[in-house]
A protein has these predicted regions:
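Post-Walker A alpha-helix
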Residues: 154-155
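Conserved lysine of the Walker
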Residues: 151
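A structural signal for short hydrophobic beta-strand segments in well-ordered beta-sheet cores
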Residues: 79, 133-134, 171-174, 352, ...
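Long, basic/Gly/Ser/Thr-rich N-terminal segments
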Residues: 1-110, 114-117, 301, 305-317, ...
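P-loop NTPase catalytic core of nucleic-acid-dependent motor ATPases
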Residues: 108-144
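Glycine-rich, often acidic-flanked micro-motifs
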Residues: 3-23, 38-46, 130-132, 136-146, ...
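Low-complexity, glycine/alanine/valine/leucine- and proline-rich hydrophobic stretches
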Residues: 252-269, 353-357, 363-381
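Long, charge-rich, low-complexity alpha-helical segments
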Residues: 2-5, 314, 365-429
Length: 429
């Protein structure tokens, strides 16, 4: 990050400032600023996670806080110091701030905002994908899978090899010609590492681990592609992690490739219809493959051998096994019922994240866990304060007089039980 010296107002050196010294960060292509503390450790940690994205860091004049410019756009994100190494973050995409965050989690919320803002801003892309992406000897793989399929861990493991370049582990912009665009944001790794992680993987993480806390850490390895670098996309790789069995590659039908790609699409700056058309065109260009695996090292070795042998000839990605039957969505386990008279409240580390007209329950570092329809969003809003299901049913009964109380109570019971099982709400007190 390009850093400029903070210039204090002459004659005020002995006066304790009413607010901490702050900076504004601007990144090329993003029309809103980021406000953060003038804290060298935080700035250095953030800088280590952003590779090649032109930026400008300037001191924020305290006078502008008292008399803000009414014509200026509100900041994209504000990181507020709350004590040594602790921060509160405010985002234009979230319905509430996150408080008491360590530096790595505060950086996580900021990078999520940057990814979303870039996806919405007109530029060199038409839509985005929630996915990981790497190149192996010049072949670009778009990696996606169900939650807990091991995407981020696989990207991190592959980052240890010199024949691999890293594009992303979360959001991948796609240009009109189908090329993948690197954002230059370091991949994030779930911590602690799995018990079965190999010594080589542990050594790699120890060497390159950047900002980290007890849940996640960033891995700014030298093979992270710079912001704006584009490469052709070749393969859509669906991750299918299982409890046992050897690593193997299967073909993926065109229909399932398209379906899985659309599931992970993020509407671009022109809106959903052009994004859908571009995603459809991309699916036609990509070869769809399924990676079935249970062991991370086996999967890594298989990918390196399979794609490393291709060289410049990428017309044939075989031999692979025949396609499997399309994977049915996993049926979630029925959660235990909750006491409908017990007050519940939202978890402090969860908030509503807005993406266009849609809303999701989101946690820093996690995927967007829950899509909220209007009714669920109203329930989530009411749980900002402790409330039992019995009270919520009464309110819903006024909003939906045609529904029976029994039906409303049953639906609400199921929703709150699932939210509780995920740790998104908990008993108050």
């Amino acid at each position: 990050l390009n850093r400029h010296t903070y210039h204090a107002v002459p004659g005020t050196e002995a006066i304790a400032p009413s607010v901490p010294r702050l900076c504004t960060l601007r990144l090329k292509g993003i029309d809103r600023t980021i406000v953060l503390p003038d804290d060298p450790e935080l700035v250095e940690a953030l800088s280590s996670c952003i590779h090649g994205w032109p930026s400008d860091l300037q001191p924020l004049d305290p006078a502008t806080l008292a008399t803000p410019d009414p014509s200026a756009l509100a900041p994209l994100c504000v990181i507020e110091p709350r004590g040594p190494g602790i921060y509160r973050t405010h985002s234009r995409y979230l319905d509430r701030p996150f408080d008491k965050l360590p530096a790595a989690t505060a950086i996580c919320t900021l990078l999520a905002d940057l990814s979303q803002a870039y996806s919405e801003t007109p530029g060199d892309h038409v839509f985005g994908l929630h996915c990981g992406a790497v190149t192996i000897c010049g072949t670009t793989l778009v990696l996606a899978g169900a939650r807990r399929a091991g995407k981020s861990t696989l990207v991190a493991r592959l980052s240890a090899f010199p024949e691999v370049d890293i594009l992303c582990d979360d959001v991948l912009p796609i240009a009109a010609d189908g090329r993948a665009v690197a954002l230059g944001l370091a991949p994030r790794l779930r911590l602690p590492l799995p018990e079965g992680a190999s010594p080589a993987f542990r050594q790699h993480v120890t060497r390159w681990l950047g900002p980290a806390d007890d849940r996640y850490g960033y891995l700014p390895t030298p093979n992270l592609l710079s912001h704006g670098k584009t490469v052709p996309a070749h393969v859509f790789l669906l991750l299918d992690r299982r409890d046992e069995g050897p690593a193997r590659l299967h073909g993926l039908t065109e229909d399932e490739t398209l379906c899985r790609l659309l599931e992970r699409s993020i509407a671009g700056p022109a809106g959903p219809e052009p994004s859908f058309a571009a995603a459809h065109d991309l699916a036609k260009r990509l070869t769809g493959l399924r990676l079935v695996y249970s062991d991370l090292e086996e999967a890594t070795t298989l990918l390196l051998r399979h794609f490393g042998r291709l060289g410049e000839d990428r017309q044939d990605f075989g031999p692979v096994s025949p396609p499997l039957a399309p994977t049915a969505p996993e049926s979630p386990e029925t959660p235990a019922e909750i006491d409908q008279t017990m007050p519940f409240v939202r978890a402090s580390d969860a908030a509503v994240r807005r993406v266009g007209d849609a809303a999701f329950i989101w946690r820093p570092g996690d995927v967007m866990l829950w899509h909220l329809n209007p009714v669920a969003r109203a329930i989530w809003a009411m749980l900002d304060e402790p409330a039992p299901a019995t009270l919520l049913v009464e309110v819903l009964g006024e909003l939906f007089p045609d529904e029976t109380p029994e039906r409303l109570a049953s639906d609400l019971q199921g929703l709150m039980a699932r939210l509780c099982a995920e740790g998104l709400i908990h008993p108050a007190g």
